Amino acid sequence: MNASASQQFTMPADPPRPPAAHSILDTPTSIPYSSGVDLFFTAVAAIMLYLHSLRDFAREVTQLGGSHLRQFLQRATANRFAGALTGAVSAAIVQSSSVVNFITMGLTEQKVLSMRAAWTVMIGANVGTTLTAWLIAHKFTGLGPIFVSVGGLWSLFGPRRWRTYGHPVFHFGLIFLALSLISSTLMPLAQTPEVLSWAGTLSTPLRALIFGAGLTMLVQSSSVVVGLTVLSVAGGLIEPELSIWVVVGANLGTGWVALFTSSSLGPIARRLSMFNAGLDLCGLALFVAVLQFAIRPLLALMPEPGLQVALVHSAFNLSAAAMALLLLPWIWSYLERFVPEEAK
């Protein structure tokens, strides 16, 4: 076939296509956001969601069962061990030792609980909050959408007289939904140069301790700090051994949160908060003197970094609580002398 014949069979060119329609979401912004900045703000938003969900859950549970919780605290403090168990169970239910401590201090001011019984409840509350770390470490965060769906639908379409019970279920699921979002953003965020540089500042136990205590005082919740620490370790952002000091600092910061909370209450509440802060300091001394040498054997018991943090967190709180409960009959009179009744 010659060239003239081949030209007769040439395919015509495609007509020009009209420009594609752009939505408002495709319009470039004037601020050039990088993927690292997007991840950072997503992580901050998830942390804020976690913090508010935790507080809302504690508020909903307290509003629904506050009177029952008060009766439970009043009846189940026959001895120091029963009081500690009561505090642990109460804090595990409401996911906040601060809420249990505040209710306990209020009951003591009203002469419903003795100051000694109230302190045993506060000792146990420190142990009860360790449940949060175990739930996160065991990846219960995947159940968040289920609880959010069930609680949300129940509060909207359930029987009218029972709809309020859907609110705490909704917020409980929202806690784990936020944790799941945090987990999904921390892993890629841990690879950015800015975060790697920041993580390098937590290179010593003292810095990690101060960071944990300061962050707890800022957000007013050790559960938030411990939960974030478990996720950070699982995502490779913090080394497991350094994360232990962040958790110890979070426990130390809880005592100072109780001190600030008690400033609006009477002298009995201030004495209790001082006792609680002293317990955290004694726990820190015990950890520095004894428990830090057992970190490596404890970490070896668990295969995953998140479970390792949860185990050491529980060991720290259980050791401090056991020490306080066993020595309570002998040290109580000295505590009352050391912190006078009209302490400011």
Protein language model features and the residues they cover:
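Alpha-helical transmembrane segments and their lipid-water interface positions
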Residues: 59-62, 98-102, 129-136, 148-149, ...
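Helix-loop-helix hairpins and the membrane-proximal interhelical loops
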Residues: 31-80, 169-210, 214, 232
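Membrane-interfacial helix-loop connectors
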Residues: 91-94, 99-126, 136-143, 153-155, ...
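Hydrophobic core segments of alpha-helical transmembrane domains in multi-pass membrane transport
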Residues: 42-55, 87, 91, 148-157, ...
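Membrane-spanning helices that line or support transport/gating and their immediate boundary helices
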Residues: 52, 56-64, 68, 72, ...
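Short, positively charged and aromatic/hydrophobic N-terminal segments
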Residues: 24-27, 33
